[in-house]
Amino acid sequence: MVELAAATCLHECGLPQAWCKQEAWRILETRFGQGLHFLTTWQAWRNDPQRPRMLHYVAVTAAPPDIDELLAGMASSPELLLLAKELAPQCLGLSTGFQRLTFDGGHVLLTLCVGDLTAMLRAQQFAADSIYLTPDPTDCPDRCAASNWRVWTAKALARCCRRGTTLVAPVDADHLYADLTQCGFELSTIQAGQPTGPEAAPTNISLRAQFNPRWTIKNTRNTLPARAMAVSSCAVIGAGLAGASVAASLARRGWQVQVLDQAHTPAAGASGLPVGLVVPHVSADDCVLSRLSRSGVRLMLQQARSLLRQGQDWDATGVLERRLDGPPGVPDIWHPQAAWLKPTQLVRAWLAQLGITFQGDAKVAALRQRGDEWELLDTDGGMLHRASRVVFANAGGAMALLDTLQARLPALNIRVNQFPVMQGVRGQVSWAMHTGLPDETFPPFPINGAGSIVPWVPVDEDCGQNLAWFVGASYQPDSQPPAPDEKNHATNLARLHKLSPKLGQALAGKFAAGAVNAWKNTRCVTADRLPAVGPLDQVDHPGLWMCAGMGSRGLSFSMLCAELLAARWSGEPLPIDAGLARTLEARRGADCHRNRLDRSPELPVSCAP
């Protein structure tokens, strides 16, 4: 059977017994192929009543898996074929780099790393519990021929290990002995055909090793320390996209999360936008912003599919991007993996998950430390909540609260000048119902560029009986006097004329007649247009964290930032490569961190939207 070798590989790693009653298990595979080992491991996890809460599977592949070959390869195994059919749709549109795919309610996380084996290993920032090693000359034909496995590849593997990590190689791997031994692995061999697998099945496993170096393990290259900490209680300040996504990611990992907001209901600020677009940023040099948005959009669409009602709360319509800022003749871009989405509905869905409690009308004015816990205080000094960790996800309000905290507790060493500069930017959306105009007036899909038009959005519970269109959005720093609604409407109409001249002409009468509604709020934007995610103080186990500054890209960034924060709390594989993760560091203004970024060739300068 096709799964025999993979099941044997699982057995030689001591699984599923080794992960029994663990919070999480982390597996690294050096050659994904068509996913046989992943599917077999996932099946074993599903079938085990004592499975860990989280299964992390990181796999390197030279190219995205071929969906037809993946399904054909599992045809002889009905159980694996069912799982392959869940995997296949998420393999659409994979590109070079890290791709995070989620299954079983976010409890099975597959991180596919598409690219050169050694480069992908060096971009990791976690310690695996098990490693499936399959050398393949095609991974790097000029350097890693099976007969000459290079020591630096073994070193890259060692960097992904903790003491006790088990490694198995389901091939003839004699040529790996010297390099792996030199890097701290203690090896044993298994003769091909020896019955060690399930039900005494023959096996082709030829190498088994355990990482147990004679020296003290030091990980000086770990610039984003990922030390797993005991699951406990957490308070999140802010119930918008940033706060709700953090709460959902932590609750899936067993945290008890209290979300506090000064408003009576969630998504009362900029996250209350009636509708937004989930679409990646594109740049000629594939800058940091583009790469981050690609990863974030994939994660967000996975959340929408699992939590929201398609056609009512969101729809995967695709989005047409007009290249209005380019030279004449630059073609438009069609984004098939893009959607419109109602942020408020997503926030509510996140906050409805088990382990999360929402507390409205709760303005946090100060914090007080009591032993290992933090007390969140209201304006009168009364305690709103107590938790072992606090996440500031309250947009622009975070900086004012941090100023107060630093003044009260100077020993915390929270230097506000190390955080990216944040400012509020007002935005107004113009919208109206589909009345008085034929349906063919509107494009069948959203269009974005310098602004956006979302033409078909249901605004009731009748799934399309009452439809509205939305055009936006204006962009004005809150340091300036607010512009009147009429001026912002005119700005939005001018943008619409550029995006879709025909539609702009058709809707001009509604704007002129004052038959257009306005929705407005203030975004929180960082100077470099990237969110701020990370600890606020430099200690071994920081209790204060930030996840803020999403700007106009909350739908692209929020789930990515939440998963990045949760991964760092839990010692998990990161959803993006370590180089990209460093660009989001909350304290990225610190001198030591700035110097490290300046030396890194992996981090091109971010580009503005």
UniProtKB/Swiss-Prot annotation:
Pfam families documented for this protein: DAO (PF01266), Methyltransf_30 (PF05430)
Disulfide bond sites: none
EC numbers for this chain: 2.1.1.61, 1.5.-.-
Cellular component terms per the entry's GO annotation: cytoplasm
Stretches the record annotates as FAD-dependent cmnm(5)s(2)U34 oxidoreductase: 237-609
Residue ranges of coiled coil: none
Main location: cytoplasm
UniProt-listed SUPFAM superfamilies: FAD/NAD(P)-binding domain
Region annotation tRNA (mnm(5)s(2)U34)-methyltransferase: where it falls in the sequence: 1-229
Keywords in alphabetical order: Cytoplasm, FAD, Flavoprotein, Methyltransferase, Multifunctional enzyme, Oxidoreductase, S-adenosyl-L-methionine, Transferase, tRNA processing
Catalytic activity: 5-aminomethyl-2-thiouridine(34) in tRNA + S-adenosyl-L-methionine = 5-methylaminomethyl-2-thiouridine(34) in tRNA + S-adenosyl-L-homocysteine + H(+)
Protein's GO biological process: methylation; tRNA processing
Cofactor list: FAD
GO molecular function, one term: oxidoreductase activity, acting on the CH-NH group of donors
Subcellular location: Cytoplasm
Role played: Catalyzes the last two steps in the biosynthesis of 5-methylaminomethyl-2-thiouridine (mnm(5)s(2)U) at the wobble position (U34) in tRNA. Catalyzes the FAD-dependent demodification of cmnm(5)s(2)U34 to nm(5)s(2)U34, followed by the transfer of a methyl group from S-adenosyl-L-methionine to nm(5)s(2)U34, to form mnm(5)s(2)U34.
Entry similarity comment: In the N-terminal section; belongs to the methyltransferase superfamily. tRNA (mnm(5)s(2)U34)-methyltransferase family. In the C-terminal section; belongs to the DAO family.
Protein name: tRNA 5-methylaminomethyl-2-thiouridine biosynthesis bifunctional protein MnmC
Gene: mnmC
